[in-house]
Amino acid sequence: MGKITIAPLTRLEGHGKVTIKLDDSGKPADVKLHITALRGFEQFVIGRPAEEVPRIVPRICGICQTAHHLASVKAVDAAWGAQIPSAAEKQRELMHLGNMIHSHALHFYYLAAPDFVLGPDADPAIRNIVGVIDAAPEVAKKAIAMRRVGQSMVEATGGKPIHPVTGIPGGLSKSMSEEKRDELLAEIDTMIQYGQDGLDLMKSLNEKYLDTINSLGVIDTWYLGLVKDGKHNFYGDTLRFVSPDGSEKMEFKPAEYLDYLGEHVVEHSYVKYPYNKKVGYPEGLYRVGPLAMINVCDSMSTPLAEEARKEFAETFGRPANQSIAYNQARLIELLSACERAKELLEDPEIVSTDVKAEVEPKAGNGVGVVYAPRGTLFHNYETDDNGIVTKANMIVATTHNVPTMEKAIQQAAEVLFKDN
């Protein structure tokens, strides 16, 4: 029996490797995805004042730091019973959308586009963002502009473009200025157009690679995402599971997550394998992220993105089970984030200074959930009478997807090795 090891994995926000064990006929018998880094943040925050934690946990991820900041502060809000002013909620949401715009542009154009724009058979030495810049400079310029504007939104609302600091229990420590609002409004229509341009690019590439999209990494799983009144929502208040064939839905609130999510320990990875507890392991394995969000929602919350979602469903089905379709789903979300950001920037409350409610530290248990760029993100803290964290649980977005990524790699390997 032979073995193929791919290490390190590239274009990965972290560290990992893949091992493929081959049977005597040279076909893949077993595939393992190893996540080889131990983080430890659940232990780091124990003994800390809870109000400090939203400034610690952004270090979990250099790309999704804003999502961790906001999920964390929402968890502390819930533990202490804070009632957040409407203006603070809107400014927090804009901060979150800025991170989504920045990260979704990075993920598609920097990590995925080299394979589509240059082709999967291109020399690996040029199959990267530098190669995209050489081959399609206008595409690269738009990607860079979207990242810049997204980061400017985070800075305007979060105080810093990297590791924001304004989220505090009860709201925000500062509000966005009218000057920053006006600067962002002047650019947002261009970002919406760039979002549409990205979708047009992806749809043209789909025609070339549709056979590959429909054959590699196609697996049946459950899907988990956030909705608000059934609509797609990055900052939503309701979690929804959808079954592999779309026939069954389960909805629950963040505080109920332990009733619905279980975690299975495997020997070959530091990551625990989450699953739908109502279904069991492994039948209840599920996916999160753009594909899942498109699959679980009844509709998008913005008009241009909703038209794109309908077209997506016609192309890939509903629910879509093709892993490579994550890329088009991500671009639909990128467009939606730009549309929603415009709505918020035109709302007078986006520059209101009423962004802080009084809140006192106390004993409590709170869960904060947001949709991070890679998928649904959970932070759960318990605090004592002095507001000190005594217990913490975090399920980061990529963790949900690790077991199903392993399944998708297994399926892709079987297809690729079928004819040796």
UniProtKB/Swiss-Prot annotation:
EC number: 1.12.99.-
GO MF annotations, alphabetized: ferredoxin hydrogenase activity; nickel cation binding
Cofactor(s) needed for function: Ni(2+)
Classification via Gene3D superfamilies: Cytochrome-c3 Hydrogenase, chain B (1.10.645.10)
Residues the record lists as binding Ni(2+): 61, 64
EC top class named in words: oxidoreductase
Domain of life, per lineage: Archaea
Record key words, sorted: Metal-binding, Nickel, Oxidoreductase
Subunit comment: The F420-non-reducing hydrogenase vhu is composed of four subunits; VhuA, VhuD, VhuG and VhuU.
Protein name (database record): F420-non-reducing hydrogenase vhu subunit A
Gene name per UniProt: vhuA
